[in-house]
């Protein structure tokens, strides 16, 4: 498992940011480089500090492919800001919740199983029985 951190403005812009950083060292075609990165880092987690200074996971995506100059991905989870409430004393409190958008792909399920995750853990995460 490879984990890293990168400063970017959104989940899907993280791949473009990785490409920009990689191009400093490697002279490769953009589409080849993006395909390599999507395969190497299929899951991207985007965190952000909100107005009330709390940090939230704003989105989790699964990068699936990069074709014809476009990133193909599925949004797995999003944090939805419902309101910004001003408390006594003038402090702001962000009200929101996480929402599941999509399930991970069958390809990622297979990859996780091949790399050691148990059926039990995967079923707890996906909420469905895995073959």
Show the residue positions of the predicted features.
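Residue-level signal for secondary-structure boundary elements
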Residues: 26, 49, 120-124
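NTP-binding/hydrolysis catalytic cores, primarily Walker-type P-loop NTPases
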Residues: 57-131
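A general structural signal for short secondary-structure boundary/capping elements
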Residues: 29, 49-51, 89-95
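Phosphate-binding/switch region of NTP-binding enzymes
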Residues: 33-67
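Alpha-helix initiation and N-capping motif
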Residues: 11, 15, 54-57, 105-106
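Structural signal for conserved beta-strand scaffold positions within catalytic alpha/beta enzyme cores
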Residues: 3-4, 46, 62, 78
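Conserved P-loop NTPase nucleotide-binding/switch module
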Residues: 1-38
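Conserved, well-folded catalytic cores of nucleic-acid-processing
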Residues: 17, 21-25, 40-47, 63, ...
């Amino acid at each position: 498992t490879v984990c890293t951190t990168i400063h970017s403005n959104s989940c899907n812009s993280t791949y473009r940011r990785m490409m920009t950083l990689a191009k400093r060292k490697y002279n490769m075609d953009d589409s080849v480089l993006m395909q390599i990165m999507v395969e190497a880092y299929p899951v991207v987690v985007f965190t952000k500090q909100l107005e009330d200074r709390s940090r939230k996971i704003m989105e989790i995506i699964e990068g699936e492919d990069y074709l014809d100059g476009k990133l193909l991905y599925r949004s797995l989870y999003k944090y939805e800001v419902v309101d910004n409430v001003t408390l006594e004393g003038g402090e702001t409190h962000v009200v929101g919740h996480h929402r599941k958008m999509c399930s991970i792909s069958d390809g990622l399920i297979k990859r996780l199983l091949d790399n050691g995750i148990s059926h039990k853990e995967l079923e707890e995460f996906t909420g469905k029985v895995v073959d």
